[in-house]
């Protein structure tokens, strides 16, 4: 019996020891599990620290290259660095928040870098402003692009208004505003504005500025104001002589070139009576070159009349200016003065040319004055009733070119021979 009791007690003790051992084993396993979690957590923090370090380095690289090279390559390098960190980090929510903080830090560093770059640019601008030379010393177009230019062998006369450039011989891209670079002549010939010193010591010693002429009395070169009552013929752009007119001198060409040659051939005869043309021009406010050009067209300045005692057109017209008593209704008044006299030139300028110009003003009041003058020249040949339009005013005149030929000859006398 005692033996049985001793055996039971031994078995109970063993069972108790086994229970204690099992409980201790479970507790040890739990502690081991807790140690592994702590170890993994510690390992994760180390990964985060390494990733944070990589991010800071990448942010500095991005800032440096952003200043010198641009953002494209830097973003690729930064993405590679982020990839390396991501492979070891895992995808925890807390780690993503850590990444967000690092990114904000990188952006702050980049903004700081941009501030430094702006500061360096400000220093460069400050050094530039300290220089004694202004930016105008380095940039800006030439003061006068028109000066020194030439076209078809003609040098420029400078920048003027387009309507003042004779024959519209200009280039409109070399001058400021609406001015053009002219290569012929300034038919307006406006007086220059006087130049006043910027800081005169005694303003009372400055000469008075010259008077500026009214726009309606502005004159062309070689055009005294006494010749400008009926418009400026130098503003006209005549077509010149027809081929039929050019055949008088056996010319193989027509136009303004032919008119120039015809009046050049008459110059010696015209110069014999130049004083007569000048006086008639002053008396009736018409340029003497226009009067002489009519004489050149009518009788070649008188060359055709020496052998006919002053008669032309088959004996119907008389004198250098060719007064047709029948067609004009003047009768014997046409022969009141010798055919080659100054009185004859003055008379025909008055009672025929000036009379027809004034009739043009009444018939075509809306025409510019220089076209009314040209219409009067056309009427000198074919009558006032024949002048209907500006473009067709020579239709029906001798060879259909009368005023275009006469005006071209007159302009030649002014431009080439100083009339």
From Swiss-Prot:
- Tell me which UniProt keywords the record has, alphabetically: Secreted, Signal
> Which terms in the Gene Ontology molecular function aspect does this entry carry?
lysozyme activity
Give the span(s) annotated as Disordered. Answer: 74-152
Lipid metabolism among keywords? no
Biased composition, class Acidic residues, residue ranges: 76-85
Assigned protein family: In the C-terminal section; belongs to the glycosyl hydrolase 23 family.
- The name of this protein is Glycine, glutamate and proline-rich protein
Q: Which organism is it from?
A: Lottia gigantea
Phylogenetic classification of the source organism: Eukaryota, Metazoa, Spiralia, Lophotrochozoa, Mollusca
